[in-house]
């Protein structure tokens, strides 16, 4: 069975954000606006998305 994934798009700039938020975006494989990353749907990835929820958008209707 295929592993579940989540697609995340960066919609906010990391400029003037805390260093931990910038590092979280890098951990999510996002470094420029409007880039999309497909990541495994794990609790750790979901936690990272929650930490920078104001800078990213989850695509494909998954919440």
Swiss-Prot record:
Q: Which GO terms describe its biological process?
A: translation
**Which is one GO molecular function term here?**
structural constituent of ribosome
Instruction: Recite the UniProt keywords alphabetically.
Output: Ribonucleoprotein, Ribosomal protein
Q: Superkingdom of this entry's organism?
A: Bacteria
Gene3D superfamilies the UniProt entry points to: Ribosomal protein L30, ferredoxin-like fold domain
Its subunit composition reads: Part of the 50S ribosomal subunit.
Q: What is this protein called?
A: Large ribosomal subunit protein uL30
**Which organism is this protein's natural source?**
Methylobacterium sp. (strain 4-46)
Q: What is the lineage of its organism?
A: Bacteria, Pseudomonadati, Pseudomonadota, Alphaproteobacteria, Hyphomicrobiales
């Amino acid at each position: 069975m295929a592993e579940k994934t989540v697609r995340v798009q960066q919609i906010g700039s990391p400029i003037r954000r805390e260093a931990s938020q910038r590092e979280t975006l890098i951990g999510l494989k996002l470094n420029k606006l409007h880039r999309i990353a497909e990541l495994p749907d794990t609790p750790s990835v979901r936690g990272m998305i929650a930490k920078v929820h104001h800078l990213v958008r989850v695509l494909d209707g998954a919440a």
